[in-house]
């Protein structure tokens, strides 16, 4: 019989899952930082909308041209970027890189020291670092004869030319691009290997080394060390680690929504009793969900469900690289009309830079209605006013609240950070589903996410396989009660043997 163990690990910067033995699944946890300055109080919706639409031009290339979707930092002032990034350590000795968290792309890439036309400073207030394979004792260049290269060439994610290097060349819809070659080196991370012991771990991974960049990628005000793609491709870090049994094939994030930002990114699963799940639409390059309807203040909007159906040029994508949220025209107009109708008596509707805004003299919580995005599987995503409103630029009469949902210029609806913030999101790739629940993503709250080792059965070969997950504080209470009852049952059964 497997044993049960509750382990509590409280730390502001790191949470992880216990590794109970060979084949166990420790969680890798990365601390997030918010690109928004802490003193920012307003957002130019037009600036964000322009940045997001440039990004969407790149995303849509995956539908028509089969080009791998890599996000760039944006086409506008980074003050309004609204992007989350994390630090990863690569090489020997380990070197730290700031990389953008992006569920809309697949592969981790960082800038090479030999990169041409690459910025040397960043408007994000971070020091830029450059990867030098020659300075890492564990680095190796992926050659054209390598099996990894031959397999990804078949999916147009690699190419071979001179120098026998397995290369890549990504061109984006805004005219920017990056090219380089694949390398293999160590990724370093912290792991819980017992109830309270943190160990330094590492694993060899394949990632991109950018040697040439063009367009907006070359501009210092938008510069960052690279992109951390969390897509479903076999070369994503999540897929690589999961294929070797180092982590489960699942990752989670909790983005803090206020001005100071931050949060947690976990290569593992966070459990919460209020979590709801919706199945991923199969055979899609992005994280597509089946959005079926939208309700405002409990009233279903008059939207034909077919406008959300997934096809070559339609669907609903979850994308952490998009700041706002975009709805297809057939859904956007009814949504705005419903919000206007709900608040017209207590606010002053105004149009600012083409966006519907409202002058409000009191808290928006008691004025604006609750919104429900309803997905397949009976999963509802409940949105508070802060999940669909943003502060606009000051106008005559005050600083308005503006609708952060925008009209998509195509048939694809995209759920960006505006609706993803202040929620735990779980991308369960093994079960092909995404889960979410409201959660306070402040560091002081996140530090009370607990580690639960729920059992250590043995397989036929005698290998210990521990089932592990991160659990929220509220879930821990119910687990303790359940385990206490199981222990009593076990004791009673043994006593009567």
Model region roles, listed by residue range:
Residues 85-87, 184-186, 252, 370-372:
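Beta-strand secondary-structure signal
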Residues 81, 180, 184, 248, ...:
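Generic preference for well-ordered alpha-helical elements
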Residues 2-39, 91-93, 101-103, 173, ...:
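Aspartic protease catalytic domain
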Residues 86-145, 187, 227-231, 304-346, ...:
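Aspartyl protease active-site motif detector
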Residues 1-99, 107-181, 204, 219, ...:
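Disordered propeptide/prodomain
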Residues 181-192, 198-277, 282-296, 316:
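Eukaryotic endomembrane system proteins
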Residues 178, 244-247, 308-310, 364:
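Extracellular/lumenal carbohydrate-interaction signature centered on repeated Trp-anchored short motifs
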């Amino acid at each position: 019989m497997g044993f049960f163990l509750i382990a509590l690990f409280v730390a502001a910067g790191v949470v992880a899952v216990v590794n109970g033995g060979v084949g166990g699944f420790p969680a890798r946890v990365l601390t997030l930082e918010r690109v928004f300055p802490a003193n920012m109080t307003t957002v130019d919706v037009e600036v964000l909308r322009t940045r997001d639409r440039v990004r969407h031009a790149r995303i849509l290339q995956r539908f028509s041209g089969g080009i791998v979707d890599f996000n760039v930092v944006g086409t506008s002032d980074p003050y309004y970027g609204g992007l989350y990034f994390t630090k990863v350590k690569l090489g020997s000795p380990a070197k730290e890189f700031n990389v953008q968290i992006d569920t809309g792309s697949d592969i981790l890439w960082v800038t090479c020291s030999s990169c041409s036309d690459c910025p040397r400073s960043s408007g994000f207030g971070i020091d830029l670092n450059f990867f030098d394979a020659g300075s890492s004792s564990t680095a190796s260049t992926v050659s054209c004869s390598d099996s990894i290269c031959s397999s990804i060439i078949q999916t147009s994610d690699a190419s071979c030319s001179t120098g026998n290097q397995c290369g890549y060349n990504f061109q984006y819809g805004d005219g920017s691009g990056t090219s380089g070659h694949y390398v293999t080196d160590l990724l370093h991370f912290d792991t819980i290997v017992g109830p309270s012991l943190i160990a330094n771990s590492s694993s060899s991974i394949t990632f991109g080394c950018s040697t040439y960049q063009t367009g907006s990628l070359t501009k210092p005000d938008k510069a960052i060390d690279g992109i951390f793609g969390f897509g479903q491709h076999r070369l994503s870090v999540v897929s690589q680690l999961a294929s070797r049994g180092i982590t489960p094939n699942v990752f989670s994030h909790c983005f803090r929504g206020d001005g100071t930002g931050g949060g947690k990114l976990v290569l593992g699963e966070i459990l919460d009793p209020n979590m709801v799940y919706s199945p991923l639409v199969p055979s899609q390059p992005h994280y597509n969900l089946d959005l079926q309807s939208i309700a405002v203040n409990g009233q279903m909007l008059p939207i034909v469900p077919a406008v959300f159906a997934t096809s070559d040029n339609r669907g609903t994508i979850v994308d952490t690289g998009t700041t706002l949220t975009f709805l297809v025209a057939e859904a956007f107009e009814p949504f705005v009309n419903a919000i206007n109708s709900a608040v017209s008596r207590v606010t002053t509707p105004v149009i600012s830079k083409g966006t519907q805004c409202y002058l409000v003299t009191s808290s928006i919580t008691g004025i604006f209605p609750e919104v429900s995005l309803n997905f397949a599987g009976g999963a509802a995503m409940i949105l508070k006013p802060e999940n669909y409103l943003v502060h606009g630029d000051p106008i005559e009469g005050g600083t308005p609240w503006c609708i952060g949902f925008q009209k998509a210029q195509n048939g694809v609806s995209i759920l960006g950070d505006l609706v993803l913030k202040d929620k735990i999101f779980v991308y369960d790739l093994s079960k092909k589903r995404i889960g979410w629940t409201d959660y306070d993503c402040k560091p002081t709250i996140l530090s009370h996410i607990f580690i639960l080792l729920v059992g250590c059965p043995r397989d036929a070969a005698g290998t210990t396989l521990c089932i592990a997950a991160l659990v929220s504080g509220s879930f821990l209470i119910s687990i303790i009660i359940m385990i206490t009852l199981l222990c009593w049952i076990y004791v009673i059964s043994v006593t009567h043997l």
